[in-house]
């Protein structure tokens, strides 16, 4: 509460409390890590409640610790019906000599306190009392805290049930404050982080979160404080590189900015250097994946430099994988490097147990004996052991695992402890350990590691937040780096709060309070997922401070310049309200401008700077609002090279409703000795009077302040009457000048020699707003293909348009009559009837009229715009296309030749494909009909059709920033011929039904299977012998559809089908036998491909087909369909394929063959539930093959049960289902 609200104190205060309760019994113990500095209480006795008529009262002050405390009372409530009571501390104050007011000695004062406020009845305090408790961080912004509704007024004044007496004893009342002042161990206890300055409080800054990359922020902070690593990064040569495509330079800059910046940084530059687009920046990736890719990229950049191999020295350890025979002296071992370790969390209590599990030996005996060289099958022990750990050890805790029951990734939230210090020697090879810990080094243990980084995830698998806890040096002080903010934390916040939490029984959860439940949920979902340990004996070396001299000079120079530029810009923003920017325009700028309006401006999106051939632009003049108009006008003339003695007029410009920037009215000031601010106020007053009458609207200080904030720039046109076209024509007629067409030379001549030119009585005339109009004229020359400003006219409203035409015809020495058009706005160009007057044609001051230069010879170029209307259309819809040579072709019709890698040009968005191809051919030096053009959007590539318009492949309401890059490919056949071919994607399966390669081809619709295989053989790489054993089949909606053979063509293959191919000797042989069977129409098998509704057919159709080609004596097997699904037969996924059944083969052997062809690992395949669907005379039978003993399954022979095209079903989760089209693999491209 401010001091001006205080009404003086009433009553008295005394130490202690009339309520027989200790502070400890009232205020709960907050935290064992938070020290209590002081606790005390005081009581305010109010002598007569009934005399409290004012809204607010203060108690006398009572000193506790370094503060004087008082109680604020709102007896009638603070915007409510209850009594409001607050507690307020007052820090030590001093006199501010500037303002004469008392101010805190420490402006950043704060006090963390637990407190309670109690009311009690004097004389009966032990029995009649009410106490509420809270806690708060008191500071200069939050000076008081308490209870807005401590007690209802009626309850205060009258007895209630269970309380025979009121709180008032003959009007008196006691209000007691209990205060416990706590030591703030971190500097942020109960902090709301408003106006929090991380750099000021901790000396460190964080990163802004640009999307889903807070895991990147955490990893960068961890690397930044691995100071030896930071020095290595600084030693990579980057002087001649760009941060946009150099990961080392971007990392150097990020690290140095973390050293010197006072504000949080963003990671945009770094992610750009990775080659990531916006989508990748907003995609959740795995921190371990990023860690390894980043290290690999840096390692490559360090090759050939003094720091080559240094990353291995600090981050790479060695482990030995071994198989050791028990009964013979034989061991097979392999030593491998590791950058980090993935440790299991589930079912383990702590880090020690995870390491024990990591090196746990597996016994190989029985059927799993090891085939030892020279010794045959032997019992053996299999495992891994460590030979060395790196100085900086990254441990990835497997908090995220795939759960087959839920068919998705889940987070392991169980409690898992990690120590501050760990001895890893128990996990090291004994022979290595003996050599390391010899007698000379027994005092030093290189396997003792101290924790320095904890990367934390709070949330579940789909949502959450990442932050990191870091101990920057050897000092025992931890900090939390949470995106933009950094603050100190306690040991408990580092360890216990990030262990996770075991799931509690539902019965216990149901008994929790709301606050307890929230804390339980937070604790359970907040856990460490990565730990960074540093070898104890190398801590000082690895964490030695990084000096300015360690940073490359070019990084220091550039970053310092950027900081200075940012500070300058921030200063400009702070002082912007003191200035107005005058954007000055003249006829000289107009005659050089090609485009809509007079010249380019901020509100105009159809202009590109590169189209401004002359380079002339508006002139910006930044002036203080306190500058006198006389000085401003002098500066304008000086800036624009106009002699000071020339008489000019200043026109205000503004945007019309159609967004065109045009002249509005001349600026007329009674005096030039007033300031710009005063002139703006007068202008505002005139405007208000025009809108609201003579009395206008009273101007207030708030209005003036709003004016200061809103009027930051003014567009002004400087009318020079001596450059008006009628005046120029008179000078030409008087032979005072040789031409009347404006150019830079003529403008300069007239400005300089005007007194000499007007001696004969020819005087320039200003356009006045009520008698004449100021019109602007443009000319279009078809020969030069340019539409430029021609000049301006000061014309009477009753003047004929034909008079203007005659003057222009004379200026350009033409005998042909001109046709004029009014440029209303982009897309609206109206022809003007020349017999009308200016008034009748509805042409007003600031309007633009255009004409076409008659008799011009069209140039021998392409494209050509023959008329002014054609050119206006081009201006309205022109776009700049950037082309590159297409390098992603997967088809055989592309040819390579020496053509430019990239080029760019302007063209109309409504250009037909033939015109676009013709433009590309000029740069690619090939015939346009042999070009294929591709629009490259982030979500796909789109090949332009030969019958299309360019606009068909642009976004609706596009602007220049939304034009995609384009690519071109030179074809060996004309595009129109190629378009008659059909695109086909072949998913080629090599060794399994899990992984495939996708190939794209263009084929004719009449292609058969053999023709197609002949076409693709070279690209895929199979032999002639293998070609005979290839099966091609289609799937639709994950269901088998049919086989492709020479009896049908690709015309019969549905566009919605997926085409698969694999070398399958057994299945291919059976299929050929089926084709040879008498009285069997092979086409019936392929009918599945012809029917686009095949996926909707019931199983009986396929069974009928199978029975139609039932086994005969010539058959040596059967073909069945394998279908994948999860839980429900309709929930299909994966590839549906054919599989052969062998006579007399038992089910376990059939299952082994299916496993080998399917391709999953033994562990994963064992989780698949198999069942069959087969046809009988009674109908289709579905039978599960689960729950049978091995002896029972040995008696099952599928060949005897199933017919051709019956089904084997595989019930298992779809491992790719959760991978959307946006889940792209992580890659650093630069």
UniProtKB/Swiss-Prot annotation:
Effect the entry attributes to changing residue 214 to A: Abolished deubiquitinase activity
Major localization listed first in the record, in broad terms: cytoplasm
Residue span, MATH domain: 39-179
Organism of provenance: Saccharomyces cerevisiae (strain ATCC 204508 / S288c) (Baker's yeast)
Subunit structure: Interacts with PEX6; promoting association with the PEX1-PEX6 ATPase complex.
Highest taxon listed in the record's lineage: Eukaryota
Active site: 214 (nucleophile), 465 (proton acceptor)
Pfam families: MATH_2, UCH, USP7_C2, USP7_ICP0_bdg
InterPro entries for this protein: MATH/TRAF_dom, Papain-like_cys_pep_sf, Peptidase_C19, Peptidase_C19_UCH, TRAF-like, USP7_ICP0-binding_dom, USP_C, USP_CS
UniProt GO BP: free ubiquitin chain depolymerization; poly(A)+ mRNA export from nucleus; protein deubiquitination; proteolysis; regulation of protein stability
Protein purpose: Deubiquitinase involved in peroxisome import by mediating deubiquitination of the peroxisomal import receptor PEX5. Catalyzes deubiquitination of both monoubiquitiated and polyubiquitinated forms of PEX5 following its retrotranslocation into the cytosol, resetting PEX5 for a subsequent import cycle.
Keyword ATP-binding applies: no
Keywords per UniProt: Cytoplasm, Hydrolase, Peroxisome, Protease, Thiol protease, Ubl conjugation pathway
EC number annotated for this UniProt entry: 3.4.19.12
Catalysed reactions, as listed in the record: Thiol-dependent hydrolysis of ester, thioester, amide, peptide and isopeptide bonds formed by the C-terminal Gly of ubiquitin (a 76-residue protein attached to proteins as an intracellular targeting signal)
Domain USP: 205-536
An MF annotation (GO) of this entry: cysteine-type deubiquitinase activity
Official protein name in the record: Ubiquitin carboxyl-terminal hydrolase 15
Observed effect of gene inactivation: Cells show oxidative stress-related import deficiencies and growth defect on oleic acid. Peroxisomes are clustered. Cells display defects in peroxisomal import of proteins containing a C-terminal PTS1-type tripeptide peroxisomal targeting signal (SKL-type).
């Amino acid at each position: 509460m401010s001091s001006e609200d205080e009404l003086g104190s009433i009553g008295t205060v005394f130490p202690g409390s009339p309520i027989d309760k200790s502070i400890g019994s009232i205020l709960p113990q907050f935290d064992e890590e938070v020290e209590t500095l002081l606790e005390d209480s005081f009581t305010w006795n109010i002598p007569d409640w009934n005399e409290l008529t004012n809204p607010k009262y203060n108690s006398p002050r009572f000193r506790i610790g370094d503060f004087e405390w008082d109680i604020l009372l709102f007896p009638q409530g603070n915007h409510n019906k209850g009594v409001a009571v607050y507690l307020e501390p007052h820090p030590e104050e001093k006199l501010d000599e500037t303002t004469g007011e008392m101010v805190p000695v420490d402006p950043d004062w704060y006090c963390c306190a637990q407190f309670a406020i109690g009311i009690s009845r004097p004389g009966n305090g032990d029995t009649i009392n009410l106490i509420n408790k809270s806690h708060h961080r008191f500071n200069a912004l939050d000076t008081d805290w308490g209870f807005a509704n401590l007690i209802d007024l009626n309850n205060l004044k009258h007895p209630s049930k269970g309380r025979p007496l009121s709180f008032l004893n003959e009007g008196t009342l006691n209000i007691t404050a209990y205060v416990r002042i706590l030591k703030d161990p971190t500097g942020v206890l109960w902090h709301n982080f408003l106006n929090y300055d991380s750099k000021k409080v901790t000396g460190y800054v964080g990163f802004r979160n640009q999307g889903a990359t807070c895991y990147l922020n955490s990893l960068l902070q961890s690397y930044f404080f691995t100071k030896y690593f930071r020095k290595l990064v600084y030693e990579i040569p980057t002087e001649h590189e760009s941060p946009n495509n150099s990961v080392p330079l971007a990392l150097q800059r990020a690290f140095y900015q973390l050293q010197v910046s006072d504000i949080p940084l963003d990671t945009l530059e770094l992610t750009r250097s990775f080659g990531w687009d916006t989508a990748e920046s907003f995609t959740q990736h795995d921190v371990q994946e990023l860690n390894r890719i980043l290290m690999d990229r840096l390692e490559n950049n360090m090759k050939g430099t003094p720091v080559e191999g240094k990353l291995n020295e600090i981050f790479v350890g060695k482990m030995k994988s071994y198989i050791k025979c028990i009964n013979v002296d034989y061991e097979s071992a392999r030593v491998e490097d590791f950058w980090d370790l993935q440790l299991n969390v589930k079912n383990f209590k702590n880090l020690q147990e995870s390491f024990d599990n990591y090196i746990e030996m597996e016994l190989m005996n029985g059927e799993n004996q090891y085939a030892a060289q020279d010794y045959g099958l032997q019992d053996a022990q299999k495992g891994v052991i460590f030979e060395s750990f790196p100085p900086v050890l990254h441990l990835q805790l497997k908090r995220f695992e795939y759960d087959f029951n839920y068919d998705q990734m889940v987070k392991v939230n169980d409690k898992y402890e990690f120590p501050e210090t760990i001895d890893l020697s128990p996990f090291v090879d004994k022979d290595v350990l003996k050599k390391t810990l010899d007698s000379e080094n027994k005092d030093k243990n290189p396997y003792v590691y101290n924790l320095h980084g904890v990367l934390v995830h709070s949330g579940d698998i789909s949502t959450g937040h990442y932050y990191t806890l870091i101990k920057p040096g050897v000092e025992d002080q931890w900090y939390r780096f949470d995106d933009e903010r950094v603050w100190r934390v306690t040991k408990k916040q580092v360890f216990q709060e990030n262990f996770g939490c075991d799931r509690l029984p539902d019965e216990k959860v149901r008994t929790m309070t709301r606050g307890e439940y929230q804390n339980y949920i937070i604790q359970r979902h907040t856990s460490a997922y990565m730990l960074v340990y540093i070898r104890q004996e190398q801590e000082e070396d690895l964490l030695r401070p990084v000096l300015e001299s360690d940073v490359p000079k070019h990084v220091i120079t550039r970053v310092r310049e950027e900081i200075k530029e940012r500070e300058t810009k921030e200063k400009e923003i702070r002082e912007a309200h003191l200035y107005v920017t005058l954007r000055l325009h003249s006829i000289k700028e107009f005659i050089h401008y090609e485009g809509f309006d007079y010249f380019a401006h901020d509100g105009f999106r159809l202009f590109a700077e590169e189209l401004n051939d002359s380079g002339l632009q508006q002139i910006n003049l930044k002036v203080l609002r306190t500058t006198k108009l006389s000085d401003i006008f002098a500066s304008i003339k000086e800036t624009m090279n106009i002699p000071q003695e020339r008489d000019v007029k200043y026109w205000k410009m503004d945007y019309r409703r159609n967004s065109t920037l045009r002249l509005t009215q001349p600026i007329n000031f009674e005096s030039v000795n007033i300031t710009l601010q005063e002139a703006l106020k007068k202008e505002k007053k005139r405007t208000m009077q025009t809108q609201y009458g003579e009395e206008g609207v009273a101007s207030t200080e708030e209005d003036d302040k709003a004016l200061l904030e809103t009027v930051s720039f003014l567009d002004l046109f400087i009318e020079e009457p001596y450059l008006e076209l009628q005046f120029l024509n008179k000078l030409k007629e008087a032979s005072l000048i040789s031409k009347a067409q404006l150019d830079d030379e003529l403008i300069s001549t007239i400005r300089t020699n005007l007194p000499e030119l007007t001696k004969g009585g020819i005087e320039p005339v200003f356009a006045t707003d009520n008698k004449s109009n100021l019109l602007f004229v443009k000319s279009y020359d078809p020969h030069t293909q340019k539409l430029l400003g021609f000049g301006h006219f000061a014309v009477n409203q009753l003047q004929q348009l034909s008079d203007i035409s005659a003057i222009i015809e004379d200026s350009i020495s033409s005998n042909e009559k001109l046709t004029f058009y009014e440029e209303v706005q982009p897309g609206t160009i109206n022809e003007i009837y020349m017999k009308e007057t200016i008034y009748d044609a509805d042409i007003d001051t600031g309007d633009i009229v255009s004409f076409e230069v008659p008799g011009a010879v069209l140039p021998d170029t392409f494209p050509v715009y023959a008329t002014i209307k054609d050119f206006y259309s081009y201006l309205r819809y022109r776009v700049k296309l950037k082309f590159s040579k297409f390098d992603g072709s997967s088809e055989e019709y592309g040819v390579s030749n020496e053509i430019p890698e990239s080029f760019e040009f302007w063209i109309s968005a409504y250009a037909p494909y033939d015109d676009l191809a013709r433009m590309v051919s000029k740069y690619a030096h090939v015939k346009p009909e042999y070009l294929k053009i591709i629009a490259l959007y982030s979500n796909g590539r789109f090949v332009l059709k030969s019958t299309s318009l360019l606009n068909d492949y642009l976004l609706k309401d596009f602007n220049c920033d939304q034009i995609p890059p384009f690519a071109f490919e030179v074809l060996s056949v004309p595009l129109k011929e190629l378009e008659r071919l059909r695109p086909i994607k072949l998913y080629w399966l090599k060794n399994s039904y899990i992984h495939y390669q996708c190939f794209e081809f263009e084929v004719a619709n009449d292609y058969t299977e053999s023709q197609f295989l002949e076409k693709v053989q070279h690209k895929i790489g199979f032999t002639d012998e293998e070609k005979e054993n290839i099966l091609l089949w289609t799937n639709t909606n994950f269901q088998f559809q049919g086989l492709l053979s020479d009896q049908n063509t690709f015309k019969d293959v549905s566009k919605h089908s997926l085409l698969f191919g694999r070398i399958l000797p057994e299945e291919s042989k059976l299929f050929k036998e089926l084709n040879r069977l008498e009285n069997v129409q092979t086409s019936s098998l392929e009918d599945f491909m012809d029917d686009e509704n095949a996926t909707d057919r019931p199983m009986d159709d396929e069974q009928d087909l199978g029975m139609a080609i039932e086994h005969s004596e010539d058959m040596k097997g059967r073909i069945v369909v394998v279908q994948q699904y999860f839980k429900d037969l309709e929930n299909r996924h994966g590839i549906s394929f054919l599989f052969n059944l062998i006579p007399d083969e038992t089910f376990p052997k059939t299952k082994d063959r299916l496993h080998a062809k399917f391709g999953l690992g033994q562990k994963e395949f064992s989780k698949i539930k198999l069942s069959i669907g087969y046809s009988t005379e009674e109908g289709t039978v579905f039978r599960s093959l689960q729950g049978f003993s091995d002896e029972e399954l040995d008696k099952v022979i599928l060949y005897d049960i199933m017919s051709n095209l019956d089904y084997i079903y595989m019930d298992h989760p779809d491992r790719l289902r959760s991978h959307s089209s946006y889940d792209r693999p992580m890659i650093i491209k630069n």
